[in-house]
Design a protein with these regions (language model features):
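Structured C-terminal helix/loop/strand segments within mature extracytoplasmic catalytic/sensor domains
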Residues: 297-361
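Active-site Gly/Thr loop motif
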Residues: 206, 211, 261-314
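Active-site-proximal loop and beta-strand segments within enzyme catalytic domains
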Residues: 27-42, 46-53, 84, 88, ...
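Peripheral terminal and inter-domain segments
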Residues: 21, 347-435
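Alpha-helical scaffold elements that line and support the substrate/ligand-binding pocket
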Residues: 44, 68-70, 85-104, 134, ...
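Active-site helix/loop module of the DD-peptidase/beta-lactamase fold
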Residues: 101-139, 186-226
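A short, well-structured edge-of-sheet supersecondary motif
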Residues: 47-78, 305-306, 312-316
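Bacterial N-terminal signal peptides
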Residues: 10-20
Length: 435
């Protein structure tokens, strides 16, 4: 038996016991509260400073550490909606759990049964892959996909080299097609469903359906678009707490225990040299010090959401990847640093205080809808066509960023936190630059 096979068995055995005997964390309040003194929750304030030092050194821009449903420590722009990058996959995994639980989706359906094909025609063997194989990144379909990283292209296996459910390959084709299948099978918009089935039940404060978008790569022979999702650190912390509680929220089993168990089953193990990690249903699985199961959603640039049920712990770290500023994930380092601050001396009813997040200090002007509509246009930037359109949320840039008028030639792009400038030609505003 190979060392990877042994590791997979070890992870599976330990992960299967992760929720056994673990006390369920409290649900967060409708608005986040924090411990008045971490000591009352069994943590040293002095030692938790090391977590903030790590945050600063790591170049992160938002951090939330939640213990037993309440905020233990936080820093940065926790209300700012950042691109989740690959963390979006874990959100979609949850939607599959909800909608397979209510019978709308059968994860054993094959691509052939679903009528799934692509511009590059799939073989009969490829079309025998089931939805659950895509959730595991084990479809056996190895063709170009929208939004691929260079490493995905470099390590893509040859077509036909592995039958479905026999080989792990972190595959954007699988992930992209899952977004389309969800809409086909449920008849619901992916992002509206995320809002109705997760954001609202979990009392998320910042997410809106417009924070999701599909985009296509016209240079590739594929009909399936990539999907992007923006979400704040404080909303992701609620999502993580749902999993920390075994799918239970406010007395309701939002995700079945069976789905949680299947999600956190290690179907594949990846050897990164200095460490191993496994993959479940669009979640990563690690063992801290070979004994403590941790589950994580990870996004390019150092974005992480980590769930440690044994310690009722949820950690979210974000980076301003909109500006190209990322960092290392450092999952193990963060968790070890937090756990090293434990004192085990608690009080029965720790004092809680509201978590106060200061809103952005920006001055905007009022502008009538008719005037805002004048700014609608298309232009070419950074290799692709961009749009400014008017809709439900007002004037929106790139289908994702609400534009707030500062003057008749300058708008502030929410979340992106940059200014979009226009010049006037023949009494019409024309896009000029972003700064």
């Amino acid at each position: 038996m190979s060392s990877l096979s042994k590791k997979l068995i070890q992870v599976a055995l330990i992960a299967s016991l992760a929720f056994a005997g673990s006390a369920t964390a409290q649900n967060p309040a409708k608005s986040w509260v924090q411990y008045s003194a971490p000591e009352e929750a069994g943590f040293s304030s002095e030692k938790l400073q090391s977590v903030l030092d790590l945050y600063d050194k790591n170049g992160a821009t938002a951090l939330m550490v939640v213990y037993d449903g309440n905020v233990l420590v936080w820093k940065g722009d926790i209300a700012r909606r950042y691109d989740t990058h690959s963390m979006r996959k874990s959100l979609v995994s949850a939607l599959y759990g909800i909608y397979s639980g209510n019978g709308a989706i059968d994860i054993h359906k094959t691509l052939k049964q679903l009528g799934i094909d692509d511009s590059v025609k799939l073989s009969e063997e490829e079309r025998s892959a089931e939805i659950q194989d895509l959730l595991k990144a084990r479809s056996g379909v190895y063709i170009p996909a929208a939004g691929e990283a260079k490493s995905m292209k470099d390590y893509r296996p040859a077509r036909g080299s592995h039958p479905p459910n026999t080989f792990f390959y972190y595959n954007n084709w699988d992930f992209n097609v899952l977004g389309v299948i969800f809409q086909m099978e449920t008849g619901k918009d992916l992002f509206e469903a995320l809002n109705a089935s997760l954001a609202k039940p979990l009392d998320m404060e910042d997410f809106r359906p417009m924070d999701g978008r599909f985009w296509r790569d016209s240079t590739l022979q594929t009909v399936y678009p990539k999907y992007d999702i923006k979400m704040s650190a404080r909303d992701l912390a609620r999502f993580g707490t749902l999993y920390c509680n075994g799918g239970m929220w406010d007395g309701h089993q939002l995700l079945s225990k069976e789905w949680i168990s299947e999600t956190f089953t290690p179907y594949s193990t990846v050897d990164h040299g200095s460490y191993h990690e496994s993959y479940g249903y669009l979640w990563w699985i690690q063992l801290l010090d070979d004994s403590i199961p941790m589950y994580s959603a990870q996004g390019w640039g150092g974005h992480i959401l980590v769930v440690v049920p044994k310690y009722k712990l949820v950690v979210v770290k974000r980076h301003d990847t909109f500006s190209g500023s990322g960092g290392d994930s450092q999952i193990g380092t963060y968790i070890r640093t937090i756990l090293s601050a434990r004192t085990l001396e608690t009080v029965s009813r720790p004092r809680l205080i509201p978590l106060e997040v200061r809103p952005e200090q920006q001055q905007f002007i009022e502008m009538p809808e008719a005037d805002l509509r004048k700014y609608q246009q298309q232009f070419y930037m950074n290799g692709r066509t961009r749009k400014i359109e008017y809709g439900k949320y007002g004037l929106v840039f790139d289908e994702w960023f609400v534009l707030h008028p500062v003057s008749d030639s300058r708008f502030y792009a929410e979340d992106l936190r940059k200014y979009v400038s226009f010049r006037w030609e023949n009494q019409k505003p024309v896009f000029d630059r972003i700064e």
